[in-house]
């Protein structure tokens, strides 16, 4: 889908670039596949802010998307492509031969009327899903599982994809968009193709209100706060903060490594940070 560039008919329109969604379905989602969604406003069960700068935004209903794709060897026809406010990618409504409906992540080049299928050995075409063990090496995939049966976790955002670069001793070697190379069990499912809406990265928000519609509140820098509010706060006139960047609670940020899961380090063949060292 193309980008829409708006003429500066008002200050808010100036610079506005959005994705053209005219080809998507304009009605409401399937009621049986939707759930209510309560806003948290960044608060936890105690009512305390655990994620700052969130709140407000347009009301949403949650679309139940099938990330597992475990209905083997049952063809499904793509009824329509839909917008989903809960993710950057588009979703596709598919209808199985027995009449059951489901939402799946829409890959690029998937059109209404196409037939998708998941199974142990199926055609390598966008929207089909099968275990990594049977996908040809070099194939572009998305919605990749990390544990068999858990459902896809890798490459689900708009325009993302993973390349299968090899297989070894029951594991598949994947190259992620970040540059990381990692192993996952070859019995994990993956869907063929790259995720839809690749132009999402080219959107220009153009006004503060549009971010508020998305539930994002203003992100205040620590350096403009008072000393009581942030370690970078205070000072006469504009200051640089005077120390290495820290969070409001004094922990190093901007480049500080936060990965703590040592148990899965052995599956990471190449770190995403290696490319930066050059």
Curated annotation (Swiss-Prot):
CC per GO annotation: large ribosomal subunit
Gene Ontology MF term list: rRNA binding; structural constituent of ribosome; transferase activity
Basic residues bias (residue ranges): 269-278
UniProt keyword terms in alphabetical order: Ribonucleoprotein, Ribosomal protein, RNA-binding, rRNA-binding
Keyword Ribosomal protein part of the UniProt annotation: yes
Classification via SUPFAM superfamilies: Nucleic acid-binding proteins, Translation proteins SH3-like domain
Domain of life: Bacteria
Functional summary from the UniProt entry: One of the primary rRNA binding proteins. Required for association of the 30S and 50S subunits to form the 70S ribosome, for tRNA binding and peptide bond formation. It has been suggested to have peptidyltransferase activity; this is somewhat controversial. Makes several contacts with the 16S rRNA in the 70S ribosome.
Protein name: Large ribosomal subunit protein uL2
Organism: Parvibaculum lavamentivorans (strain DS-1 / DSM 13023 / NCIMB 13966)
Taxonomic lineage from the root: Bacteria, Pseudomonadati, Pseudomonadota, Alphaproteobacteria, Hyphomicrobiales
């Amino acid at each position: 889908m193309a980008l829409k560039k708006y003429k500066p008919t008002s200050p808010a329109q100036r610079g506005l670039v959005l994705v053209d969604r005219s080809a998507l379905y304009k009605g409401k989602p399937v009621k049986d596949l939707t759930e209510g969604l309560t806003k948290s406003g960044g608060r936890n069960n105690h009512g305390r802010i655990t994620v700052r700068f969130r709140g407000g935004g347009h009301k949403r209903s949650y679309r139940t998307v099938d990330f597992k794709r475990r209905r083997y060897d049952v063809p499904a026809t793509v009824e329509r492509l839909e917008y989903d406010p809960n993710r950057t990618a588009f979703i596709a409504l598919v209808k199985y031969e027995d009449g059951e409906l489901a939402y799946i992540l829409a890959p690029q080049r998937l059109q209404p009327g196409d037939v998708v299928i998941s199974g142990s050995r199926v055609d390598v075409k966008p929207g089909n899903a099968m275990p990594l063990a049977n996908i040809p090496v070099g194939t572009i995939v998305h919605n990749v599982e990390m544990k068999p049966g858990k459902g896809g976790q890798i490459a689900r955002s708009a325009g993302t994809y993973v390349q299968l670069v090899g297989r070894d001793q029951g594991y598949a070697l994947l190259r992620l968009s970040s540059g990381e190379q990692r192993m996952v069990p070859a019995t994990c499912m993956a869907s063929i193709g790259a995720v839809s809406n690749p132009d999402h990265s080219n959107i220009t928000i153009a006004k503060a209100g549009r971010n508020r519609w998305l539930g994002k509140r203003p992100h205040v820098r620590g350096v403009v706060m008072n000393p009581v509010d942030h370690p970078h706060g205070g000072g006469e006139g504009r200051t640089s903060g005077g120390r290495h960047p820290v969070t409001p609670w004094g922990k190093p940020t901007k480049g500080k490594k936060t990965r703590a899961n040592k148990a899965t380090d052995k599956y990471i063949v190449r770190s995403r940070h290696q490319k930066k060292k050059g």
